[in-house]
Design a protein with these regions (language model features):
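Core AdoMet radical
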Residues: 1-16, 21-33, 52-64
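Aromatic/hydrophobic pocket-lining residues that form the small-molecule binding cavity
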Residues: 8, 38-41, 84-87
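Catalytic cores of alpha/beta
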Residues: 33-47
Length: 281
């Protein structure tokens, strides 16, 4: 519906003529621009890759994100596991071709595709220097690698038993189960993983950073949350203790009957689950 969509190649040529460089993103809408259209899009973008000063440095292929706030007549639908497998099957062979041409994958699939498809994420090395991490390409893989490192030398037991709840988006829950199992093998540690949906956005499969305060209340209000609730900091606006739906962290703390700890990374999650951090933050 964008009247200038057909001008993309001319616009990229304009960038190339002026030695301007971009990292591109392709948003896939099932039945609209996947399949052969996606392959053609990536080949078109690859015309501007390679050489001493490429106009297109990398491409992220991401699924369309649909919320309940969109027009009902937009003709779009959410990505399902079959769609995800189809997109992966279309892009991975092209990555091998691009490796031969550019010594780089050039085009990367965001982590959501593999999680939606129920497949293992690619190796950390395959993301090279993570050029598209801000677009969700490799961010979960990097987080899993950090969790693996943080749980490498766990103690056999903890001095004081600690029962915790850890909240994540439903989409990443299954990928975190091995880490949960390792932590719960420590005597005295009881960690429950809550993979939540988002009634606020109208999404069943959601990443952790999109969970809102209302989603947390909806999913946790009647749960046994133990001694503490671990909330990843990505749920809050940067530098501001407010969720995406404008609910404040103070309001959540006043409503849920459990101490809430904001955790800022893999090492802090593990330390909190082990009871190694005393003061709630």
């Amino acid at each position: 519906q964008n009247p200038r969509a057909g001008q993309l190649l001319q616009q990229l040529a304009w960038f190339a003529e002026r030695d301007l460089q971009i990292h591109a993103q392709v948003v896939i809408c099932p039945d609209q621009n996947d399949g052969e259209a996606l392959q053609r899009t990536l080949q078109d973008l690859a015309q501007f890759a390679g050489g001493e000063w490429p106009a297109v440095l990398s491409v992220a292929v991401v699924p369309v994100g649909l919320t309940r706030f969109r027009p009902a007549s937009d003709g779009l639908r959410a990505v399902n596991p079959a769609d995800a497998k189809k997109v992966i099957a279309a892009v991975e062979p092209l990555q091998k071709e691009f490796q031969t041409r550019f010594e780089s994958n050039f085009a990367w699939l965001s982590d959501e595709w593999y999680l939606i498809a129920g497949l293992s994420l690619p190796s950390r090395a395959s993301y090279e220097d993570f050029p598209q991490q801000e677009n969700g390409v490799g961010s979960i893989r990097a987080f899993l690698a950090a969790l693996d490192e943080a749980t490498t030398n766990l103690p056999q037991s903890v001095e004081k038993p600690v029962k915790s709840s850890w909240v994540v988006g439903r989409l990443v829950e299954a990928a975190l189960r091995p880490v949960l199992k390792r932590l719960n093998a420590v005597e005295g540690v009881e960690l429950t993983l809550h993979g939540l949906t988002s009634p606020y956005w109208g999404q069943d499969q959601v990443v952790t950073g999109l969970l809102t305060g209302q989603d947390l209340l909806s999913g946790l209000m009647d749960q046994d949350l133990g001694d503490q609730l671990l909330l990843p900091s990505v749920m809050l606006r940067q530098g501001d203790p407010v969720f995406l739906d404008d609910m404040t962290l103070d309001h959540l703390r006043a409503t849920l009957p459990v101490p809430i700890r904001i955790v800022h990374g893999a090492a802090e999650i593990v330390a909190s689950a082990l009871g190694s951090i005393e003061k709630s933050t």
